[in-house]
């Protein structure tokens, strides 16, 4: 199990889906080291489980301003890494 602490900064998403996002991101961080690969893994998993089209941004330093579908947005930290996941389109 990972020692990364999940801190949800902002969410418009069901509790169940939020937990799924954290679990999925934890798996991605255990599997990959490159941020682009981590983001791709999370995006593809959410496309499969919750239907397209999901977008995922992973990094330590970024700003964002996005439009998302209602109840399909989460921004959280897993350890030092920020993850923005949202559905749009």
UniProtKB/Swiss-Prot annotation:
Gene Ontology terms, MF aspect: disordered domain specific binding; dynein intermediate chain binding; dynein light intermediate chain binding; protein homodimerization activity; transcription corepressor activity
InterPro entries on file: DLC_sf, Dynein_light_1/2_CS, Dynein_light_chain_typ-1/2
Coiled-coil ranges from the UniProt annotation: none
SMART domains for this protein: Dynein_light (SM01375)
Tissue expression pattern: Ubiquitous.
Pfam families: Dynein_light
A single Gene Ontology CC term: dynein complex
Main location: cytoplasm
Keyword annotations: Cytoplasm, Cytoskeleton, Dynein, Microtubule, Motor protein, Transport
Transport in keyword set: yes
Single biological process term from Gene Ontology: wing disc development
PROSITE patterns, A to Z: DYNEIN_LIGHT_1
UniProt note: phenotype after gene disruption: Flies exhibit defects in bristle and wing development.
Compartment(s) of residence: Cytoplasm, Cytoskeleton
Oligomeric form and interacting partners: Interacts with spn-F. Forms ternary complexes with spn-F and IKKepsilon.
Protein family per UniProt: Belongs to the dynein light chain family.
Known function: Acts as a non-catalytic accessory component of a dynein complex.
Name this protein carries in UniProt: Dynein light chain 1, cytoplasmic
Species assigned in the record: Drosophila melanogaster
């Amino acid at each position: 199990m990972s020692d990364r602490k999940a801190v949800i900064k902002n969410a418009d998403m069901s509790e169940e889906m939020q937990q799924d996002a954290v679990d999925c991101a934890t798996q991605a961080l255990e599997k990959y080291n490159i941020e682009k690969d981590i983001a791709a893994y999370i995006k593809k998993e959410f496309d499969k489980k919750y239907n397209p089209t999901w977008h995922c941004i992973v990094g330590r330093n970024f700003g964002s301003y996005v439009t998302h579908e209602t109840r399909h947005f989460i921004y959280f930290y897993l350890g030092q890494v920020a993850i923005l996941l949202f559905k749009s389109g």
